[in-house]
């Protein structure tokens, strides 16, 4: 029994370490791609980020479920609100005189495209974490079955 408990502790530690390394690698890869191609500052827009994160939060609260479901719903809500933010930005561009001034279309479109970027980036991170949570739940169920038999 003690050996099984010790083995589980070691495996859980390595599982959490691999999750940490994976998330750091994903974030590093995205930041590296941003830095290699352009100015880092153009990828940050506070209102766009708030729309995506707040929308994802309220989406996960409304959808309900257990912790894994809420985390998965947070990622799904981030993608959906990312696209809603994009559509809102395009509608705002179309309603204003920005279409007439061709010099302003590029920067305005870049800001509008940030919301789907944020949404998918959050979805990737939450997807990795949800998969790990599902894996941990499966391992716990298998361990309980072994202990019962």
Positions of the model-derived regions?
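Cytosol/matrix-facing juxtamembrane amphipathic
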Residues: 131-149
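Hydrophobic alpha-helical transmembrane segments of small proteolipidic membrane proteins, enriched
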Residues: 7-137
């Amino acid at each position: 029994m003690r050996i099984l408990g010790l083995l589980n502790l070691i495996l859980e530690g390595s599982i959490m370490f691999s999750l940490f390394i994976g998330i750091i690698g994903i974030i590093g890869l995205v930041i590296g791609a941003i830095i290699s191609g352009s100015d880092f500052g153009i990828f940050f827009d506070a209102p766009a980020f708030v729309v995506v994160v707040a929308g994802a939060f309220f989406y996960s609260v409304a959808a309900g479920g257990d912790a894994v479901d809420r985390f998965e719903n947070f990622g799904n809500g981030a993608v959906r609100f990312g696209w809603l933010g994009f559509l809102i930005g395009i509608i705002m561009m179309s309603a204003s005189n920005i279409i007439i001034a061709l010099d302003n279309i590029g920067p305005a479109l870049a800001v509008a495209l940030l919301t789907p970027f944020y949404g998918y980036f959050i979805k990737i991170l939450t997807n990795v974490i949800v998969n790990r949570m599902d894996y941990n739940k499966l391992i716990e169920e298998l361990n309980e079955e072994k202990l019962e038999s």
